């Protein structure tokens, strides 16, 4: 069925290599005989979620099935596997440990059933094993070191032994075991500085973390030496040099390096959204950090180790409307494109708004981290991943720095291109004020997709778009008056506004010149996915 045409899409009569003034036209040029190599899938290696217990919910599982199918995510990382709401550890009256893996089994079995694997964050501390009362978040995650490192070692050994027995050695060798989460932030590790300044306390916290790391990796590898253990899982790419030096000096394995990065001007932790965040106007934000860490690893004893950014996003608080806005899709694609092979994975934080660090949220759109909101509504950020997952297995060389052009085994071609514009006015304006409003995207002129050395014949051309008021569910919600609770009719309206249906679906012909050329109007932060499917 012919869809309404929402774009300027005129077949161009001139040959696909005809010159155009650079200032007048953006040209995305690809020759199907010029291959760059296999399409990188580092973008969907892993995705984040809030905490393990949320993974027992039907709506969480429904949403993960959806993003697994449409975006191709293979691993998932979450906090709280060892929190008391997972019931993993108690002690009897004599202080003997009691282990219980029933909730863990339920969650991991579900992941196995949909073809995903856990990227296992080993934390937080079970209450009965904790050395202190300090907690974080609404769900009271204990952030203190173990009261007895030998009991911690035995606990980790028992846990790893259990999953090995349940899923098999060969399977667990494909998992990752990450020691703790953001130990360079007092809120996540130790819980108190004891009156010391941050500078005075940092080496104390780091020393205690390395004790935890050493104990944990020995426990994991006592089950199987080939199991992968890494860290330091820090905020802001912190403690990288220190961790590389410590593990090298002690002869400890560091099978992978993990850390986090967010594109904000300052800060690392704000679960309640009270501080106010500011999106960085540095186009190299996140990208520069990743490349710097990879470079330092390459000069270390761990040059062969993988680099996993196990959290990243535009902002580190689940109360930032930039997460809901149309700006997010182009932001994500810009980072994925420019980071490239510097990271083994970039695990977006998170796939869902079902996220309870500050407790259940009271509105359908509140600046949550998720690609999907509570009602399964697809945000613009979701489409960045869905579009990436539509790319074929072979990437073509392309002259445009904000594009991927790929082909698949069936003879199809996919072109994904975007504009990444940072509209944030001045640092004095916080995200919570700027991105909650309706901001019209300015026109950027046409982009022309030119393909050469195509097979002659008829193709079905599908064009998909995300941008301002195009699969822009936040704008549609604003149009409804920003209701705090949604009726079924309103959900249906919003679902229709973010359906992801093609805005153009037609047949096109590639003639004897083997060229295809088409123009598409671009606005700020528009994203286009063009698919050409051969018709037999």
Model-based region annotation:
Residues 84-88, 127-136, 184-190, 264-271, ...:
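Short acidic/His/Gly/Ser-rich catalytic and metal-binding motifs that mark active-site loops
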